[in-house]
């Protein structure tokens, strides 16, 4: 049986056992004159045909046709057992040489597949580093180039919210000020109505005084007419008396002197004139007092009315300015809302485009993961086949080394666990059991 050269070694550990390709001690080796360079031939006088048949069937079942990364290989082994002289005859030597060549070719292909797998891993890492800079694994994602835009958008949204809150605060303050001015206006309006009612009452009093004055003037005119009438009657009576005296006989009698009518009339006239003067003075004094009071109240009411009118004008101007400012703030608010809506729609479209690119990248990553999983499964299968072959080679080495000694063969159990992983999640676990005959002394 020919094995690998002693220049290269390969160690695979499983269940606490290690297998090396350089398995034969240096003292038990004999160099082959017809083998491949770097190979070893071990000759034995006799090997049981059952062992050779078992090894042939094991190789046939352990090396199926497979493809990996575009390279295909096939392995099929057949032996014709001829008894104890299989390894001693020419056909036995050729069969062992063919087996050695096939095993060396298989191990070379395994090494090449391992190298290609390593190259694929490097390419995948390079692809991740190019597509997503600064990452080393499929789960890492870098959104660093979008952080500045997102931060700017967040700052703009926060500024718009602050401006909106400020505008709403100004609007609330303006509403409160308008309500305050409205209350003041209503109070001043009620005061104005009260003053106007007082002015109307004073006007009625003034009209009553004017009517009383007119009535007094009419009474004075009536008294004057009556006085003139009395004077006229007195003159007529005097003329009639004087004319009657001239046409009659004057008879003088000693009698008591009579009252002088003119004096009585003069006294009556003086009394009436004094009474009229007193009434006129009292009426004028009362009228002047009332007129002065009315003028004072009218002046005060006029001043109050003027001050209230000026305050009302100021309030109207303030209300107009506040309404203008309110309209300006509402227009600014609508403009900011439209700008914010446009900005949100624009950046929403950009975020959708970026999300679509991210989805494409994730699909590509999923495909790469599936390919890697498939390659990993094939690699695990080939590794398991290699371990089986190395275990059987070790068994045959022990059998060949103990050709001159007798011992018992003990079956060792080797368990191989195969896990199916998808995105780092274990879907299923399969345990393969292999019985290896080992010679014990």
From Swiss-Prot:
Alphabetically ordered keywords of this record: Coiled coil, Intermediate filament, Keratin
Positions of region (Coil 1A): 92-127
Q: Which domain of life is it from?
A: Eukaryota
Q: What InterPro entries does its record include?
A: IF_conserved (IPR018039), IF_rod_dom (IPR039008), Keratin_I (IPR002957)
What would be an example GO MF term here? Answer: structural molecule activity
- Which stretches of sequence are listed as region Linker 12? 242-261
Q: Where is this region: Tail?
A: 404-441
Task: Give the residue ranges for region: Head.
Answer: 2-91
Q: Where is this region: Coil 2?
A: 262-403
Q: Where is this region: Coil 1B?
A: 150-241
Tissues expressed in: Expressed in skin.
Region of interest: Linker 1: 128-149
Can you list the GO cellular component terms from the UniProt entry?
A: intermediate filament
- Domain (IF rod) ranges: 92-407
Pfam families for this protein = Filament
Family listed? Belongs to the intermediate filament family.
**PANTHER family, per database record:** INTERMEDIATE FILAMENT, KERATIN, TYPE I CYTOSKELETAL 17
Quote the record's miscellaneous comment: There are two types of cytoskeletal and microfibrillar keratin: I (acidic; 40-55 kDa) and II (neutral to basic; 56-70 kDa).
Assembly and interaction partners: Heterotetramer of two type I and two type II keratins.
Write down what this protein is called.
Keratin, type I cytoskeletal 15
Upper classification of the source organism reads: Eukaryota, Metazoa, Chordata, Craniata, Vertebrata
Q: Which gene encodes it?
A: KRT15
